[in-house]
Amino acid sequence: MNPPGSLGVLEEKEEEHLAPPILGPSIHSDNPQERIQARRLRIAARLEARRREALGEYLDGKKESEEDQSKSYKQKEESRLKLAKLLLCGTELVTNIQVAADIREIHRRVEEEEIKRQRLEKLENEVKTSQDKFDEITVKWEEGKQRRIPQELWEMLNAQQVHCAGLIEDKNKLISELQQELKMKDDQYVKDLKKQSDDICLLLERMEEQVKNVMKTFRQELQNIEKAFEVERQELLTSNKKKWERALQAHNAKELEYLMNRIKKVEDYEKQLNKQRIWDCEEYNTIKIKLEQDVQILEQQLQQMKATYQLNQEKLEYNFQVLKKRDEESTVIKSQQKRKINRLHDVLNNLRSKYNKQVKQFQEENQSLTSDYKRLVLQFKELQKAMRHFALIDDKRFREIWLMNEEEAKDLINRAFDVDRIISTHHLGLPWMAPDFWFLKNVGPISQQQQKSATQILEEVLMEAEKEGADEDSSESETYLDLPKQVSARTTRKILMLLCDESGFLIESKLLSLLLPLEKNECYLLRLDAVFSALGIENEDDLYKLVNFFLKYQTHHSPSSQEPLDLRAEKERSLVDGKSQEKEPPPSPKLIHPNDVLKILEAFVMSLRKPRDFWVPVKLLKAVRDDSKDSEYWEALTTVIPATTLNLWDALYTALEKYHLVLTQRAELLIENSSLERQNTELQQLLQQYLDTKINSELQVPPTQVFRVPTK
């Protein structure tokens, strides 16, 4: 029986034999043409595999190996689960002893705390009672010092002895109780030690038993796994032997076929050689006759060439004399040119020295300019830092001033609302409701609405496309987004799906493996999010630019884009306004070939990179805040009380002034009335005093008979 390791090596060798290394173009390459070629080769390999499968040439060994692997994997998983369950149960059985010991210790500590608390309370009570008794004995000793009668002293001494004996007896009793409790604790400690030793023995027994069970189970499962691998090995040997026999039969058949074809080819070659020999003989005779004729013609030409040679020799002698004279003239000219070259060399040396001086001067100027440039850059950065600091301070002060003015304005508005409420409810008797304006809930400077991100727009597009796909057969109208040329959500979704399928090289392999168990829409959403991150598409405008770029690229590069494509393009063009009727309809994404997606993406990325090549001035401050709605906001705060209410307040103010005047006059009259009443009371008192005098009773006609005295 072979060990499992050798079987694993055989499986690895078989996998290496079945899966040769890929030496051609890769789909992960940076070159688009190489990726396209790799895709084409992969498609061709799939077609070849389908053809072989149809012809019965498919390798059945791979399927058998997968089945065998599934059997061994199943056996290993069963063994792993069984062993894990056994280890878990054994661990729980062993740890139960520790858990029980911990619970007993917790209960013991709780009881010990309670007993300790009771003991302390008992000792405190004993101390208090003993102190009271001791104080009582001490007081009686002081009283005994004051007594002088011996009998009383004797009685007092006996009483003091009794009290002291009682105090000592209480102390001895407490000591005996504490000693008894200490003895019980010693006994309990011995029992706990015995219990712990018993628990340790039990723990060791269970651990030994668990180790034996685990070892036994491990051996049994190992035997089962070895049996499963041995069965797989036998099946693999049988299948390989069958494949080898089939391969030998096919090889023998091909050898026989090759031998028959070779015999036929030898016979055909012999016939062709005979024909070639006859044709070569005929051609040889023909060439021989032709060459003899050519020899005669060449002899005639040789005679003519001799005559021509004689004539040319005389001409050459004459030309030699002419050239000799010209050589003498060229020697004179050459000497003149040498003198001229020497003068030019002197001029060149002077120019070189001047050039070196200029280069040195320019280098010094360059160094000085470079140092000035660095100094200016540092000053510029410091200026940038200061301007950013002042910008932040200005923003902070602006917000503080805004909040202060806003709080003051809202306090005044609340006071105005309180006045309006009091006037309406108390003076006019009308119901009053607090107004609800948008600017009353605002706190701080007014901020503009943020732009949507590309992921949010993508979710909306997928949702709209699902709704359109559900109503595609029964609905004739489409929902359009705010995309260029009023492109439908379905068209946008097709473009994005095509982009997602053809730009997988922009997504990491780990992310692709994590996206497999997800749903289709979630998978598309996450993949497109990764593609957008790689392309630098962040917001709504960038997504619209990408879709518009796809449509424009297809319009300029497709010859059939000048004609109406389908009924959907007609519907899209009919929804655009009057100006858009003169424009061309948007092309259908069905006409965009998948191989053109990479070219379009490359052109789009290059168009995004072009503006970055130019120098852009550094942005010193953050974007200028939009203050177009500030004046509207503050004017709205000043108009919270309408003009009708202000007119009502003016009329009420006039009426209240009149009412105040009447109340003032009434108060003055009340003061005058009270002064008159006081004077009247004083006069009545004087009159009563006059009437009550004794002189009036002596008169014949008293004043009380002449007039009636008014009573108060």
UniProtKB/Swiss-Prot annotation:
Superkingdom of source: Eukaryota
Main location: cytoplasm
A Pfam family assignment: NYD-SP28_assoc
Amino acid composition bias (Basic and acidic residues), ranges on this chain: 565-585
GO CC entries: axonemal dynein complex; axoneme; motile cilium
Region (Disordered): 1-34, 557-591
Subcellular locations according to the entry: Cytoplasm, Cytoskeleton, Cilium axoneme; Cytoplasm, Cytoskeleton, Flagellum axoneme
Keywords: Cell projection, Cilium, Coiled coil, Cytoplasm, Cytoskeleton, Flagellum
GO biological process, one term: regulation of cilium movement
Coiled-coil regions listed in the entry: 100-388, 663-698
This protein's record includes keyword Nucleus: no
Self-association state and partner proteins as the record states: Component of the nexin-dynein regulatory complex (N-DRC). Interacts with CCDC65/DRC2, DRC3, GAS8/DRC4 and TCTE1/DRC5.
Family in the record: Belongs to the DRC1 family.
Functional description taken from the UniProt entry: Component of the nexin-dynein regulatory complex (N-DRC) a key regulator of ciliary/flagellar motility which maintains the alignment and integrity of the distal axoneme and regulates microtubule sliding in motile axonemes. Plays a critical role in the assembly of N-DRC and also stabilizes the assembly of multiple inner dynein arms and radial spokes. Coassembles with CCDC65/DRC2 to form a central scaffold needed for assembly of the N-DRC and its attachment to the outer doublet microtubules.
Protein name: Dynein regulatory complex protein 1
Organism of derivation: Bos taurus
Name of the gene encoding the protein in the UniProt record: DRC1
